[in-house]
A protein has these predicted regions:
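Periplasmic c-type cytochrome electron-transfer domains
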Residues: 1-177
Length: 177
């Protein structure tokens, strides 16, 4: 048997430390779920539930985090003007822990989330589900890009989309991408 010296173990980067937090269930009440539980690989599970972080008590779908650094404001109601505040609230209230996270933990999570490039549009070549050119024409004619601006298909402000939330009297929402 030969030994191959590989050198010293490198120090983990902020991104690696953030990934450890993101995938660890030890940061949640009872130790049974993690950020990854609702954002698999940084994406979205597609289920609706109340995350508690935005304080409205209403169910909503956890968003995809790919490219999220570029999509201010954060939360459905735009409550968070910085991603640091959103991540801190998620680590504290959504994960149901008794004390707020350290600034270092928030920075590490941000480094990990910042490494998640925007997802390419989903396209199933076996079942394209319609005419993409016609869809693009409808998108343009309906002026969808007014609220869903390329390249991230969102805008940095809230929009009245004609829906009234009777529980918190909210009329303006953060346009999802």
């Amino acid at each position: 048997t030969r030994k191959l010296p590989l050198g010293p173990t490198p120090e983990p980067t902020k991104r690696h430390l953030g990934a450890r937090i993101f995938f660890s269930s030890m940061r949640s009440l009872g130790g049974w779920y993690s950020c990854h539980s609702c954002h698999p690989e940084g994406g979205s599970r597609g289920h609706t539930f109340d995350t508690h972080a935005d304080g409205d008590g209403l169910a909503k779908k956890a968003p995809d985090l790919h490219g999220v650094l570029h999509t201010a404001p954060w939360a459905w109601n735009g409550k968070f003007r910085t991603l640091e505040a959103q991540v801190g609230a998620s680590l504290h209230t959504t994960m149901a822990v008794n004390e707020p996270p350290s600034p270092e933990d928030v920075d590490n999570i941000l480094a990990f989330i910042g490494s998640l490039e925007p997802s390419p549009p989903y396209y199933d070549s076996r079942n394209p589900g319609g005419d993409p050119l016609r869809g693009a024409a409808i998108f343009e004619k309906a002026d969808c890009s007014r609220c869903h601006k390329p390249p991230y298909y969102t805008v940095p402000n809230l929009k009245d989309v004609g829906v009234f939330d009777e529980y918190d009297e909210n009329r303006e929402f953060n346009p999802p991408s």
